[in-house]
Amino acid sequence: MSSLYYANALFSKYPAASSVFATGAFPEQTSCAFASNPQRPGYGAGSGASFAASMQGLYPGGGGMAGQSAAGVYAAGYGLEPSSFNMHCAPFEQNLSGVCPGDSAKAAGAKEQRDSDLAAESNFRIYPWMRSSGTDRKRGRQTYTRYQTLELEKEFHYNRYLTRRRRIEIAHALCLTERQIKIWFQNRRMKWKKENKTSGPGTTGQDRAEAEEDEEE
């Protein structure tokens, strides 16, 4: 009995849900079709017309939004012509040349200098006497290794003049040419003469004859 009493008191305190919805707290039924409901303000059939009218007020240039392209909308809003969007590189380069005239002048000067250099090179002629031949070129000083110098000194100690056959053998053994061996022995003989100070007609004539014989061999 007591439990039934408390239940009736509780239900009497909170009215039924049907009465709450009927009184107008939630007068409309929940549905996803907002656009088809004529009683909902802002989503009715006339909302599109009011939105278009408001947009026409913002952009007094004319027509609805659906009929205008993006370029037309921006042109009407910011006072730009549609032809201003068709920009090419040529006017941009012309503007740059107008802003920086010094660069174009430098480029033109460099081109003229290059053309003049090419013309001068084409007109310049090299004659045969201007070219240095292989025999006229200055040869660098030959450097001998320590082993080569030691072997040549040994050979010079035993014989100051070499025959052609012996010169070829030494050249092959020391990886040198015959001319290099010959020049080394000539220089070594001159140094030996200065060191010993050999003077006298007999000795000089004998050395000269031996040198000529060495060159002929």
Swiss-Prot record:
Residues 137-196 bind DNA. InterPro entries: Antp_homeobox, HD, HD_metazoa, Homeobox_antennapedia, Homeobox_Antennapedia_CS, Homeobox_CS, Homeodomain-like_sf. Residues 193-217 are annotated as: Disordered. GO terms for molecular function: DNA-binding transcription factor activity, RNA polymerase II-specific; RNA polymerase II cis-regulatory region sequence-specific DNA binding. Coiled coil: none annotated. Pfam families: Homeodomain. GO terms for cellular component: nucleus. CDD domains: homeodomain. GO terms for biological process: anterior/posterior pattern specification; regulation of transcription by RNA polymerase II. It is found in: Nucleus. A motif (Antp-type hexapeptide) lies at residues 126-131. Keywords: Developmental protein, DNA-binding, Homeobox, Nucleus, Transcription, Transcription regulation. Sequence-specific transcription factor which is part of a developmental regulatory system that provides cells with specific positional identities on the anterior-posterior axis. Belongs to the Antp homeobox family. Forms a DNA-binding heterodimer with transcription factor PBX1. This is Homeobox protein Hox-B7. The lineage of its organism: Eukaryota, Metazoa, Chordata, Craniata, Vertebrata. The gene is HOXB7.
